[in-house]
């Protein structure tokens, strides 16, 4: 299977399936000399971990990460970092009744058509279980970006179905089960999901993100524009169906006199572009939104076919998230960290000695 790696200079390759013995990744290109421990990575994994609240899948995985290589006496060595998480709470029998059925909205049909076979246990490689390793790798990139460059990455639940976060309190994001900056909205989300779970249905979500402390100059035009690589990274996350950078789709109704971010010696006057101009970071905050579809695994009967093309009714049992947007928040942060880290290293490799005639203006 091709397509299991991301990045050029800071490259991450993941492996493993939902119900296999383990999942893992190789992080290649991490600079040497950075302090790193399993605890540094575990902090991020615990935010994504299944079973952390009643509103997510009740699969109980500890997600304890093991560092296999690339770290010696607490410091990164510059060699490939091997990470492993052992799967401990698989229930493959939950899928035995649907092993010959195509679940609507899932990758069952396309995997079978592409590979001629498929791992029906929890979706195999197509499962969001794989994203745990992205979060693990992203924790390494995020630590470097924060400590070396002062880059801060923050994502949050901005909308769940009809419920919007109307207030923004950054401190509140870590104080509720939804990573929501609006305490009142988080309460409404909890009530909404309780009812939805009883119905056996699911709901979509929108995750917003902001990266502050961005260096100027990251991005490789024309095909590796910063927002292009971010879009690819976001669209690689299970269930993501759309991404908007800056003002996103609102630009359709904007005029150029409004949208163009005016500049002065004192700094930018607005940030409709979302921190990227011509595919290169401007030094302003990088802002984006990601739309996430409803979970396809629901207990409501749906029409489908089996592997022989015969009509069938599908009811998905097992343990599933009624809203995958909740656990997508740390995944979005991780993917942002991986892309920004990779582009910083690429920029440094070519342009480390560049002296622009004008110092960066304030963001």
Curated annotation (Swiss-Prot):
It is an enzyme of class 4 (lyase). The keyword NADP applies. It catalyses: 5-O-(1-carboxyvinyl)-3-phosphoshikimate = chorismate + phosphate. Reduced FMN (FMNH(2)). Its cofactor is FMNH2. Its EC number is 4.2.3.5. Keywords: Amino-acid biosynthesis, Aromatic amino acid biosynthesis, FAD, Flavoprotein, FMN, Lyase, NADP. GO terms for biological process: amino acid biosynthetic process; aromatic amino acid family biosynthetic process; chorismate biosynthetic process. SUPFAM superfamilies: Chorismate synthase, AroC. Pathway: Metabolic intermediate biosynthesis; chorismate biosynthesis; chorismate from D-erythrose 4-phosphate and phosphoenolpyruvate: step 7/7. The keyword Membrane does not apply. CDD domains: Chorismate_synthase (cd07304). NADP(+) binds at residues 48, 54. FMN binds at residues 125-127, 238-239, 278, 293-297, 319. One of its GO terms (cellular component) is cytosol. It holds the Pfam family Chorismate_synt. It comes from the Bacteria. One of its GO terms (molecular function) is chorismate synthase activity. Belongs to the chorismate synthase family. This reaction introduces a second double bond into the aromatic ring system. Homotetramer. PANTHER family: CHORISMATE SYNTHASE (PTHR21085:SF0). This is Chorismate synthase. The gene is aroC.
